[in-house]
Structure formats: C-alpha cells, structure tokens
C-alpha cells in the first residue's frame, strides 16, 4: 500500500486518531508565520478535513478566501461538513493531486483562477505524504504572487532527549503514510527569504515560514 493510500485508509476516523492536540501548535505557529491580513487569499495544500480553516478564518475574515486542496474525496467530504457547520461562505474545496496542481484544476472546481492569485500558501503535515513532494511545492508556489508568504509544517524523528519517542513517531507516521525522513521544509529554506523557524516536541515538529522570491514560473 502506497503512502497516499495509507493516508486515506482511516478517513472516517481521521479526526479522532490524528493526535491533533500534539500537532495543533505546529499548525498555529505555521499559520502565524504567514503574516495574514484581512482579505488575503490562502492556498491550503493537503487540507484534509479542514483543521486549518478556523485559524485561517480568524486571520483573513469574511473578505478573504481559502482554497483547500486534497486528493482524497473522503477527506474533502469531512471538510465540507466542517464548512457547513460553521457557515463559512469563503472556503472553496478542490480535489486534485498536488503534484500536478495548476490553474486548470482550480477552474474545474469553480475557483477564480486569476494568475498568481494567492497571497499565501500553506502545507501542514502534507508534503511528507506525497511521493514527489518537491514537484508539489513547485506547482503550488507557482500559483502565488511575488513576495507571497509560504509555510511548511512537517515532521522528523525526535531529537536529543526526546529520541526515546522515535520508534513511536516512526510507527505513527508510517501508518498515516508520511515519510518521516523527507524533511520537506528544506526546500523552503533554500527558496525563500526572511525565513522564520520553530522546532517543537523535541524536534519532532518542524515549522518554517518564508517569503517567495519574485519571478517564479507559473504553470497553467
């Protein structure tokens, strides 16, 4: 079973078994690192069931727009229910493979696909799920405006005094489909400026936020 398949295997129980209390702080720090303003447009790549949406909504307000992208129809069904319960009218969901994401995917889902439309791009615990995560990074960031903020939140093996937890972390990531050795935040460190970084839970959770350099090629 491949990593994407493992990600969707327990979709119905995802919110219960995702250990969100452990990983919530990483999400919130990552979203804070985007420096969002009211009215901003945010691309949430690998949005899952929409755990990021409440915090994003607080930052961008009713005048902003969230576009959540996920490959799993089941995850998006749960995200849609979350949106309905909260009455958010400014969240769009797109079912797409992040590794081939482009404006045509957005248009097909009825999303305004103006060139370089996004003020921020967010990856929380999602890139390490993807087989070709560098390509997913390129596709998503190509949809953002110059000087957009980007955040990557992901996982590695616990470090130093927390190494005793490493076997448990490795097993949990394997069951969920994440490659704990991927370290996808390294691409953000190379390709953005003004990088902010945080390390949580004995180094298990890594958070990076940076500003995109101008002139990235857009893929249509």
Model-assigned labels for residue ranges:
Residues 1-35, 51-55, 78, 165-171:
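Conserved class I S-adenosyl-L-methionine
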Residues 43-45, 49-101:
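Class I SAM-dependent methyltransferase SAM/SAH-binding core
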Residues 61, 130-131, 144-145:
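Helix-to-beta-strand junctions that scaffold the AdoMet/dcAdoMet cofactor pocket
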Residues 99-121:
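A short acidic, Gly/Pro-enriched loop at the edge of an enzyme's catalytic core
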Residues 120-132:
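A short SAM/SAH-binding and catalytic strip from SAM-dependent methyltransferases
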Residues 134-146:
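A short glycine-rich, Lys/Arg-flanked "PGG" loop and its adjoining helix->strand segment in the class I
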Residues 151-207:
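C-terminal alpha-helical "lid/dimerization" subdomain adjacent to the S-adenosyl-L-methionine
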Residues 208-220:
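C-terminal lobe and adjacent flexible extensions of AdoMet/dcAdoMet transferase-like proteins
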């Amino acid at each position: 079973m491949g990593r994407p398949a493992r990600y969707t295997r327990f979709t119905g129980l995802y919110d219960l078994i995702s250990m969100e209390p452990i990983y919530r702080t990483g999400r919130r720090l990552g979203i804070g690192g985007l420096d969002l303003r009211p009215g901003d447009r945010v691309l949430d790549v690998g949005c899952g069931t929409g755990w990021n949406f409440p915090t994003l909504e607080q930052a961008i307000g009713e005048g902003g727009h969230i576009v959540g992208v996920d490959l799993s129809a089941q995850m998006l069904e749960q995200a849609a229910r979350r949106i309905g319960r909260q009455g958010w009218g400014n969240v769009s969901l797109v079912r797409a493979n992040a590794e081939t994401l482009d404006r045509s995917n957005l248009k097909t889902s009825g999303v305004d696909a103006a060139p370089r439309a996004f003020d921020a791009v967010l990856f929380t615990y999602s890139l390490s799920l993807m087989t070709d995560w560098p390509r997913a990074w390129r596709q998503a960031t190509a949809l953002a405006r110059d000087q957009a903020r980007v955040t990557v939140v992901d996982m590695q093996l616990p470090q130093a005094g927390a190494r005793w937890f490493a076997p448990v972390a490795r097993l949990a990531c394997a069951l969920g489909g994440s490659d704990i050795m991927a370290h996808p935040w390294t691409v953000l460190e190379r390709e953005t400026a003004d990088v902010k970084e945080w390390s949580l839970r004995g180094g298990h959770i890594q958070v990076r936020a940076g500003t995109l350099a101008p002139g990235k090629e857009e893929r249509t």
